[in-house]
Amino acid sequence: VYGVTLSDELIKRGNNVIIVSDTLTKERKAKYIKLEFNKRGLSERINQIKTLLKIIKENDIHIVHAHSRASSWSSQIACKIAGIPLITTTHGRQPVHLSRKIFKAFGDLTIPVCENIQTHLINELGVSPKNTVVLRNPINTIEYPFAAQKKDESKKILSIIGRLSGPKGEVAYKLLEILSDMKNLEIRLIGGKDIPEKFQKFFKNKNIKFMGYVNDVPEKIKESDIIVGAGRVAVEGILSGKPVIAIGEAKYIGLITNNNLSDALASNFGDIEFSNSENFNWNLLKNDVESAFTLTKKELFSLRENVEKEFDLNIITDKIEKIYARLYVLKRKYDIPVIMYHRVVNDESEGGVPGTYITAKKFDEHMRYLK
């Protein structure tokens, strides 16, 4: 999702982007080339490197930006041979073992999506702090218009959004155990094609609805009064003006306000701890649900503004483009030509005796050429 969002915006700004990946089902503007990074045998790795070098040469690629461990490994070697920068985005905790410390494969610079990942990379994998910069996963915030919660309905809709398997499934199950007896709530579970057997005990509860996989999550967020989730789900909920209780795979953040937003951002709303540990305080859950209904429209809008500054697609893309340009110049060791204009005049008659001027017409021609 994030790779396509970023590539579409880069293309919109006049860049040429090619996506190389195992699979890609999302619509995109970029050209797509299939390459099975998930195959990690030696012969497959060599083939990946050869293919990447061919793509780099044939398409005059200046920068490679990898978004997974598997693609980073092959890209590290291909970029080294090609003499171009590699940038990686690190979306989660990485395995900590000797081979990873020796061959880090984080490129010339890695972009952890939250502060806890950055701390993990520096402390546990020995990545230099100067080779990391935190940037959130970009979101096109205009797709999530602010809509204050509904106040007039007797039964409120609380939506738990995320998978029902793995660690997120364990969190969802615990949520149902605690909240299933709250009479004023309709609890919706959104996500997951298959419902694990242990959830069947909640089928008879009329206040609990298993929605399964849905295509239009933003629409379901609009219908809700409270959102429970982590990562992108929490961000989308806040942008949409909904109270959000952030609970991820690693941590219970609770009801998000401006007071605990920095803690939420650092952990990607509960999904990532800087150490490999879990930190849940389920005793706060029911109180957080009640408190969510007391948040004012002003408080929710202020929270949205602060989150928008962190995740806005245009802001993030601006920063990434500057990173691309800086690293390319450093890697290729190019000098940057500088043109200095002393004076711009409307007509040559205004030039004066020294004649150190340029006409506005000629200046405009220069700018158009440079662009």
Task: Name each model feature, range by range.
Residues 2-44, 192-199:
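N-terminal strand-loop element at the rim of the active site
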Residues 66-72, 90:
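Short His-centered aromatic/hydrophobic patch
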Residues 107-132, 139:
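A short, active-site helix/loop in glycosyltransferases that binds the activated sugar's phosphate group
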Residues 122-123, 130, 136-154, 166-169:
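Acidic anion/phosphate-binding donor-loop and adjacent secondary structure
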Residues 146-149, 274-325:
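A charged, aromatic-enriched C-terminal amphipathic alpha-helix characteristic of glycosyltransferases
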Residues 152, 157-198:
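Conserved catalytic-core segment of nucleotide-activated headgroup transferases in glycan assembly
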Residues 191, 196-214:
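Nucleotide-activated donor-binding/catalytic signature segment of Leloir-type glycosyltransferases, i.e.
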Residues 325, 329-371:
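Terminal accessory/targeting
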